[in-house]
Swiss-Prot record:
Gene name tied to this protein: avaK
Organism, scientific name: Aspergillus versicolor
Protein name: MFS-type transporter avaK
Keyword Protease part of the UniProt annotation: no
SUPFAM superfamilies assigned to the protein according to its UniProt record, in alphabetical order: MFS general substrate transporter
Function: MFS-type transporter; part of the cluster that mediates the biosynthesis of a highly modified cyclo-arginine-tryptophan dipeptide (cRW).
């Protein structure tokens, strides 16, 4: 049986298949997750509050003993923070079911058992690995010039899921109880799990588009045992001096991203909103993020290309730097917001930097050889997972410090996030853009352009 090079129609069909199935998977998974977030936080708070009050019957109740008091909120931050950490050890269907089992039987099971959900995520690797797989699939079937647009479209689906999940969750809580969206989301995750089995195989698709002699050369390079493959991955990290700052960017950016998990509790406590109200306010950020992805990021990219005579990779670097600056200003603005109006404006401003991850993914991809893309993204996924391990307890502790010091200090986690993103910017600026040529053995010779 002979291989044939795919036609334009074959290529378009494969691209449509990858985009459609990944979009559905993203939509169902993230709609389910964000549908359950406000009710889950409310259920956690109720469980903590009832446990604390039942265990301290002789303790006179004061202002600090209410469910929105510092004691309950500090414990809620601790539970959510460490839950995030154990989830980074990683996730999916079984862990979500386990979280619901602990909540249903909270009268006999301590709430801290939700931390074990992370152990059930160890099969498969969790969200970073899923994100990495989706990214590699896009890289496999799209040309370099079309990859950024494809990734932006996929992330737009992610944002759309968050936008529609918030009002749906609020409506279900208002009409029934927090348990209704909490359990419906689990059923949606089963649907998403079923969709994952339909994802097409894209490995080798790029090689099919190349001439036979080029494909034979690449396939020869793929032969070898597992040790050789690990050696190649290690060689990429050691020989490509840009890998160190790329790893730092993914590690630290994932830490700052985890601060978003506490926005619901932060805004609810600081401005005395219900969790459903806080989640609806966060929709403003998601709507602004969608505008950023669909309009502002492409417009900024075109503007940079129009005024800059540097390489496309250098222009992508400028896009990452600009997006990073917006994140720094956004986090500081959230931390210092004194009124709900200023807070909403700060959320909208932070959303202007929401394209950083996608921009950085495309920028980093352009810095390696095509056959090193998978190694690059798996390394990035590992760095993000490690960042998730640190972020949960770190931001939980910062939230607790804020509660201990008083409402004026609740923004401490977001001051820290802004400082972390300054580190990200320094790492991005340290990346050197290099032109590539091949030596006699087909290995890249790196020459500095910028």
């Amino acid at each position: 049986m002979t291989d044939r090079r795919p036609t334009i129609m074959d290529k378009a069909k494969k691209q449509w298949e990858v985009m459609a199935l990944n979009s559905l998977l993203i939509l169902f998974t993230n709609f389910a997750i964000f549908l359950s977030m406000p009710p889950q936080t409310e259920i956690f708070e109720d469980i903590i509050c009832s446990k604390m009050h039942s265990e301290s019957a002789l303790h006179p109740q004061g202002e600090d003993d209410g469910c929105r008091g510092a004691l309950v909120q500090s414990e809620l931050a601790r539970i959510n923070g460490w839950k995030t950490t154990f989830e980074a050890l990683p996730r999916m269907l079984l862990s979500e079911a386990w979280t619901r089992v602990v909540c249903i039987y909270s009268d006999v099971l301590p709430l801290s058992l939700v931390w074990l959900s992370g152990l059930l995520r160890s099969v498969g690797g969790g969200e970073p690995v899923i994100d990495s797989i989706m990214c590699v699939m896009v890289m496999d079937v799209f040309e370099e010039s079309d990859r950024a647009v494809a990734l932006l479209r996929l992330h737009s689906v992610f944002i759309v899921a968050k936008i529609f999940a918030a009002p749906a969750s609020a409506a279900l809580v208002a009409l029934t109880s927090a348990w209704t969206p909490f359990l419906i989301s689990l059923a949606m995750l089963f649907v998403a799990q079923a969709l994952s089995f339909l994802l097409p195989e894209t490995l080798g698709y790029v090689e099919q588009k190349e001439p036979d002699d080029s494909r034979a050369h690449k396939m020869a390079g793929k032969k070898g045992n597992l040790n050789q493959r690990f050696a190649l991955a290690a060689r990429l990290i050691v020989q490509n001096r840009n890998m160190a700052p790329i790893i730092i960017v993914n590690l630290v950016a994932s830490i700052t991203k985890s601060s978003n998990h506490f926005l619901l509790q932060y805004s609810s406590t600081k401005y005395e909103w219900s969790y459903s109200q806080s989640n609806l306010v966060l929709v403003i950020r998601e709507a602004s993020s969608l505008l950023t992805y669909l309009v502002l990021m492409p417009a900024a990219s075109k503007a940079i290309r129009r005024v800059s005579s540097k390489s496309v990779t250098a222009q992508d670097k400028r896009l990452c730097q600009g997006s990073g600056l917006l994140n720094v200003f956004g986090f500081f603005s959230i931390a210092l917001a004194g009124t709900p109006v200023v807070y909403v404006l700060a959320l909208a401003f932070l959303s202007l930097g929401s394209g950083f991850d996608t921009a950085m993914s495309g920028f980093a991809t352009s810095l390696v050889q095509p056959d090193q893309i998978a190694s690059l993204h798996s390394t990035a996924a590992t760095a993000k997972s490690l960042g998730g391990l640190v972020a949960g307890p770190l931001f939980a502790r910062l939230m607790q410090v804020g509660f201990e010091l008083g409402s004026g200090w609740l923004g401490i986690p977001y001051i820290a996030a802004g400082l972390f993103f300054i580190t990200v910017l320094v790492a991005v600026c340290s990346i050197r853009i290099q032109s590539r040529s091949l030596d006699e053995d087909g290995q890249p010779l790196l020459q500095t352009d910028v």
